[in-house]
Every structure is written in C-alpha cells, then in structure tokens.
Amino acid sequence: MLTTSLTLNKEKWKPIWNKALVFLFVATYFLDGITRYKHLIIILMVITAIYQVSRSPKSFPPLFKNSVFYSVAVLSLILVYSILISPDMKESFKEFENTVLEGFLLYTLLIPVLLKDETKETVAKIVLFSFLTSLGLRCLAESILYIEDYNKGIMPFISYAHRHMSDSMVFLFPALLNIWLFRKNAIKLVFLVLSAIYLFFILGTLSRGAWLAVLIVGVLWAILNRQWKLIGVGAILLAIIGALVITQHNNKPDPEHLLYKLQQTDSSYRYTNGTQGTAWILIQENPIKGYGYGNDVYDGVYNKRVVDYPTWTFKESIGPHNTILYIWFSAGILGLASLVYLYGAIIRETASSTLRKVEISPYNAHLLLFLSFVGFYIVRGNFEQVDIAQIGIITGFLLALRNR
C-alpha cells in the first residue's frame, strides 16, 4: 500500500516536471549570457525523455508517424549528405551539430515526448505563455542594454547595436497579439501598453525585414481572427507614420538612423550582384550537387570566386541573406526539395486546424505557430539567413498538439 502511494505521488510530479522543462526551454531560448543554464535545461530534458521512453517504449513511436516528423528526418539526412560533400567536413559537422543534432531534430524529438500525456488545451497554454515569457525576458534584457547605452550618451534608434534581437521579436510576436483575444478589458489595456513597448524595441532593431514580417503577421492575424476594427486602427496609424516620413523626405539622416531606414526604398544590395544575387550565381554553377553545409563553407566558396566577378558589391562574403538559398547552396537540389517538404508539412499541419475553422481564442496554438512560422521563415527568411534550429520549436509543439 505504501509503495503504491509513493509511486502515485511520483507520477503526479511527472507532468509538472515535464511542463516546467519545456516552458523553461522556450522562455530562456533567446536570452544571451546564460548558455550554461540553457544547456542544463536541455540535459535535463534529454535525461527525462530517455527515462520515460525506457519505461514505456512502445507508446512513443506513434507520436512520430506523420509528415511533420518525416520532413524533419528527411532534411536532417540530406544535411548529412551535405557534410559528406563539404570541402571542410569538420566545420560542416560542427554546424550540423549546432543546428540539427542539438537543434531542430532534438527539439522535435524532446517536446512531444515530454508533453505526451498532456491535452491539446494544456499544450496550447504552454505555447502561449512560454512565448510571452520569452518575449518579456528578451525585452527586459534588451532594456538593460538601452540603459547602458543611454548612460554612455547613445540614444535609441541611431545604431544597429540592437539589431540582434529582431529574430526573437519576429518569432514570438504572434503570442503578443493573442493577448488581445482575452475578453477582460483590463487585459486589453495591458495589451496596448505592451504593444507600445514592443513597438519601441522592434523599431530599435532598424531591421526592415523584421518590420515587414511583423506587419504581414499582424495583418494575417487580424484577418484570420476577424479583428476588423484593429485593421482600421492599424491602417490609420500606418498612414500617419507614412505622412510623417514623407514630410521629412528632404532631410538626409545618417544611414544608421531610424528615419533613414523608414525612408529607404532600395534593397540594401540584396539582389543584382548583392548578397542574394551572388548566392544565386553560385547556386547556378552547381545547382544539383551543392557545395557543403555551413557558413564557413559558403564564405570560403564566395571569397574564392569573387575575383572572377569584379561587379559583385561585396568583396568578402557576408552570407546569402536568404534561408532557402543557403540550404540550396549547401545541399543542392535535394536540400531545396527537403526544405520545401518541411515547409509544406508545417503549413499543412497548421492550416488543417487554422484555415478550415478559425477558433477565436488566445489559446489557438496552431494559428500562433503558423504565424510564427510565416513571419520568421517565410517573410524574414526571405531577407535574412535565419536560424534553422528554431523550426524545431514549431515542429515539436505541432507533434505535441497531435497527442490527444
């Protein structure tokens, strides 16, 4: 009797422990300077997952019998191929280890295993509140840097010093929007305050790609949740901002100032002979096989070939600035196909629950993950080479949402 009671008490703590690990993992994911603690969380997640799988090995394989996991597995295998063809296999494997083995493949495995016994409603709440906490902590950490800058006489919106936070601002943005869907007026007031704070930080990145991603995600969110009044208010605000920018058109601000970025209409040397244009030229020279995985491989090939193309804007590589081009360059046509397969699987999984019947609720996790994916990988990934590892957070939660 006593043994049975102790066993039951241990089982009661298991879901709390599992949920806490997943929550902490997402909440701290974008924080800098706490690498050892983030590694500790991952280690605890791995140990817990291994223990639970060993206790009931036959109950876990069904979690991964679907196109989302298959697409993750295919991309992982294709990137193994890209290591084998790499001129620097050591660097390619290091990149593979960071982004795949310790990145999206690991996250895709761990999250659904740890949340296996949770309902869709519980998983949806973890998604929302872990994203919100992560966004809050990221903004809090960045505010400290702004204070330090101010003490040095550096004002906001005049340098690219805060550009590094744009990834987290785009990836986590849909969670902020979902606060509006809570019915209490007090919470809606909190939403307005938090939105003003968010606007400060996103403008401070001086990243037009991030701005565009946030704009598109915001419009999609409002349409899918039928928030027509917010669309009207947003359109008015954009018109006012646009008018203010136009009135300042004759001013010639510093290229690292906010006003300059708002007025800028060119592509920042992305296309013809720029970052993406040159990446496309290199891909055309070897579209089937690819060159090998890793930023160092790309830089090496680019820097070697730039002497043959005197019209290229950048004499040293600064990357392809496009996620799809990066994978295509790395693994050839198979890499492109596998990435498209993964993107398609995610869109299909989220759209099956999102576009068919939109549930106007702050806990609509499928819609939140869909918008996070679109903003970060489809829109921002078209202007920057975004971190592929984070896609494992999306796929991991999507698999967890299939449990029940």
UniProtKB/Swiss-Prot annotation:
It catalyses: a lipid-linked O antigen + a lipid A-core oligosaccharide = a lipopolysaccharide + a polyisoprenyl diphosphate. It is found in: Cell inner membrane. It is a multi-pass membrane protein. Pathway: Bacterial outer membrane biogenesis; lipopolysaccharide biosynthesis. Its EC number is 2.4.99.26. Pfam families: Wzy_C. One of its GO terms (cellular component) is plasma membrane. PANTHER family: O-ANTIGEN LIGASE, TEICHURONIC ACID BIOSYNTHESIS PROTEIN TUAE. Transferase involved in the biosynthesis of the lipopolysaccharide (LPS). Catalyzes the transfer of a polymerized O-antigen molecule from its polyprenyl diphosphate membrane anchor to a terminal sugar of the lipid A-core oligosaccharide, finalizing the biosynthesis of the lipopolysaccharide. May also be involved in a feedback mechanism to regulate O-unit synthesis, based on the availability of O units on the periplasmic face of the membrane. This is O-antigen ligase.
